[in-house]
Amino acid sequence: MSTPPVPHSPAPSSFPLRPPAPPLDLPLIGHGYPALLRTPRARRWNPLASFGLVLAGLVGLLVLGGVLGALALIATSGPALLGAADPTDVTDLDLYSAPMVLLNNLLLAALIGVALLAVALGHPVAARFVHSVEGRVRWRWLARCVVVLTPLFLAYVLGAWALDGAPTAPRAQDWVWLLVMAFVLTPFQAAGEEYLFRGWLLLAVGTWIRRPVVAAAVTAVLSAATFSLAHGSLDPWILLDLAAFAVAAVLLTWRTGGLEAAVALHVVNNVVIIAVGTLVGTVEDSYVGAETAGSPAATLLSVAVVAVATALLLWQARRAGIARTVPVTVGARP
C-alpha cells in the first residue's frame, strides 16, 4: 500500500499584511474635545454644512414655538388678550404660567437633538462624541458634578435672597407644576443650551482651528456673545454675567473632555434659582428676559460663584481621573 503524499504548507507571502483600516466615524486617539471632528476625512465645508442644519433647526423650533406659544397664551390669558386695547401688547399676559414654561423647556431641550443631528449629518464623526471624548455621557462624572455644586449654589441663591431683604410674594396658582418642571424638565433645557452653545460650537470651530487653546478661545468669544444675546436682555451687567458663564462652560468642556461638567453647572444654577423663586413667589425674577436689569454687585457675586464652581469641577476632574483626550480603546489611530 502506498502512503498518501504529505501536503506542503503554502509559501509565505512576500507582501506584508496591511493593518485593518480604522472605523471611519471615530475621532483620533489623543485628540481633545475641540479637535474631535478633525480627522483625515474632515473637510473645510463640514462646519458650514452643520451650521446650515443648526440654522434650519432653530428656524423650525422658532416657528413651532410661535404657533404653540400663541395657542398657550390664548388658553391661559384669553380674557386679557381679548380685552386689551392693543392685542399685540403681551405685558399683562402670563408668560410664566405652567404651559408657557413647559413649552419653553421642551423647545430648548430639543436643541440637544439639533446639535446631535448637525454633527451626524454635517461631519464624518459619530454624533455620540458630542457628549464627550469617550463617545458617551459619563453619568457618574455628571452625578459627581451635581453633588459638588448643589451646596454651593444653595448657599449662593439663599444668601443673595436674604441679603436682598428676603422678598416674598403669593405663589403662582400652578406653583406645584412649576416646581415639578424645575426638577424634571429644566435639566434638559439647560443641557440643550450647552449642547448647542458649547458642544456643537466648540466642535465646529475646532474643525477649522488646529490649536485647541485657540479653538477654545475663539469659541469662548462666540459663545459668550451668542449665549448672552439669546437671553434677550441688553443690560450690560446681565450680558457680562451671561458671558462669564459661557466662558466658564467652554473652559470646563475643553479641560474635562466633555459636556458633563458644563451641563451640571447650568442645571444646578437653573434648578436652584427657579425652585427657590417658585417657593418664595418670585419665580418671574428667576428668568432673564428683555426687561431684566442687573447691578455691579449682583454680577460680581455671580461671576465669583461661577469661578469657584469652575475651579471645584476642574479639581474634581483631576481627582477622578476624567479623560480629557480620546482614549486608545475608543478612538482611531492616526
Regions found by a protein language model. Name each.
Residues 48-55, 101-102, 106, 142-147, ...:
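Hydrophobic alpha-helical transmembrane segments
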Residues 105, 127-192, 202-210:
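Juxtamembrane helix-loop-helix connectors linking adjacent transmembrane helices
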